[in-house]
């Protein structure tokens, strides 16, 4: 059994330890905000936070999560259900288009802003490498 936390709640996973985190989240825990895009860790649609750092869930095996903390887009809002400031900015700036890639983009942005609180356009372009499935971004 592999024990870890997802969005602050304990998880005791007794399935295939080599299952990718993406499928454990979506199929076992019914957390469908994390999206499947490429399956090879390139597009970023599946970005979650593991111990506070952005990681691609489609290439992360559950076996690597023992004792770790996973945050998904569903867990990004505060306990009071107040949107995270990045989520709020996404809405205020009217960013949403089709929305498929946005959970991953939001998660990547939150991680990026922790180390780059006042980024330049060049910083953003160099560090946010998520791909947009519909081509809007």
Regions found by a protein language model. Give the residues of each.
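Signature of N-terminal electron-transfer/Fe-S-associated modules in redox systems
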Residues: 1-137
